[in-house]
């Protein structure tokens, strides 16, 4: 099994759409792909990232562990619900149960890299370290993204983690000077693996499949699965 952790520089940067696009591309390439979302918040507001991944990507191997009603950070959402966060051991066992030779397992975090997902401050970075997984970082194209991206990459490097690259999660239809200048600057920080159009989540499945097919390099995706 190859595990790839998908994180973002912030919440709302397009992690779920990026995860769905990569999963869709992998499925089309004939790769056995699974997607897991260990911690989901905001279920009372209808947030269901795995359902969105299923609708957009056509992937059927989906798994979730902990779900909390309020649209808050996991620690606050768990406290508001009177529930516990999963332990480190539960999180790792949950991901490990998806294990299968030749499978690509995408693990979508919640918020950014250092947001607590589990008891005792466990983060997506901690999971990546324990799993020996590379991390794909979803970024904004807007003002402020260079600092946020550099900080995320620095946090990965501090634990010896490999960055699998960047995905620009929502490229505007009419980019301005900020976006057009940030794009090469992001590419100088780490390889940009895909640039997804703003509004991709609203596309029909067939349209989204076409977008995902053109967004990623097929050889890179195939190499992810080993």
UniProtKB/Swiss-Prot annotation:
It is found in: Cytoplasm. Its cofactor is Mg(2+). One of its GO terms (cellular component) is cytosol. Mg(2+) binds at residues 16, 49, 108. Substrate binds at residue 41. GO terms for molecular function: ATP binding; dethiobiotin synthase activity; magnesium ion binding. ATP binds at residues 12-17, 49, 108-111, 197-199. The active site is at residue 37. Disulfide bonds: none annotated. CDD domains: DTBS. Pathway: Cofactor biosynthesis; biotin biosynthesis; biotin from 7,8-diaminononanoate: step 1/2. It holds the Pfam family AAA_26. It comes from the Bacteria. GO terms for biological process: biotin biosynthetic process. Its EC number is 6.3.3.3. InterPro entries: DTB_synth_BioD, P-loop_NTPase. Keywords: ATP-binding, Biotin biosynthesis, Cytoplasm, Ligase, Magnesium, Metal-binding, Nucleotide-binding. It catalyses: (7R,8S)-7,8-diammoniononanoate + CO2 + ATP = (4R,5S)-dethiobiotin + ADP + phosphate + 3 H(+). It is an enzyme of class 6 (ligase). Its main location: cytoplasm. PANTHER family: DETHIOBIOTIN SYNTHETASE. Belongs to the dethiobiotin synthetase family. Catalyzes a mechanistically unusual reaction, the ATP-dependent insertion of CO2 between the N7 and N8 nitrogen atoms of 7,8-diaminopelargonic acid (DAPA, also called 7,8-diammoniononanoate) to form a ureido ring. Homodimer. This is ATP-dependent dethiobiotin synthetase BioD. It comes from Mycobacterium avium (strain 104). The lineage of its organism: Bacteria, Bacillati, Actinomycetota, Actinomycetes, Mycobacteriales.
């Amino acid at each position: 099994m190859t595990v790839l952790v998908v994180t973002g520089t912030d919440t709302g940067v397009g992690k779920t759409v990026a995860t769905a696009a990569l999963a869709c591309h992998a499925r089309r390439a004939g790769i056995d792909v699974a997607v897991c979302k260990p911690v989901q918040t905001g279920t009372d507001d209808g947030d269901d990232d795995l359902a969105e991944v299923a609708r957009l990507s056509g992937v059927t191997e989906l798994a979730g562990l902990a779900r909390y009603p309020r649209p808050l950070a996991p620690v606050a959402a768990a406290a508001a619900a009177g529930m516990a966060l999963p332990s480190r051991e539960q999180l790792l066992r949950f991901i490990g149960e998806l294990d299968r030779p030749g499978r690509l397992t995408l693990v979508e975090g919640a918020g950014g890299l250092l947001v607590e997902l589990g008891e005792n401050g466990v983060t997506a970075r901690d999971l990546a370290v324990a799993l020996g997984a590379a991390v794909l970082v979803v970024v904004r194209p807007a003002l402020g993204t260079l600092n946020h991206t550099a900080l995320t990459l620095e946090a990965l490097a501090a634990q010896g983690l490999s960055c699998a690259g960047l995905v620009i999660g929502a490229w505007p239809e009419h980019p301005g000077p900020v976006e057009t200048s940030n794009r090469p600057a992001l590419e100088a920080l780490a390889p940009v693996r895909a640039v997804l159009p703003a509004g991709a989540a609203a596309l029909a499945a067939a349209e989204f499949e076409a977008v995902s097919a053109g967004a990623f390099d097929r050889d890179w995706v195939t190499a992810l699965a080993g």
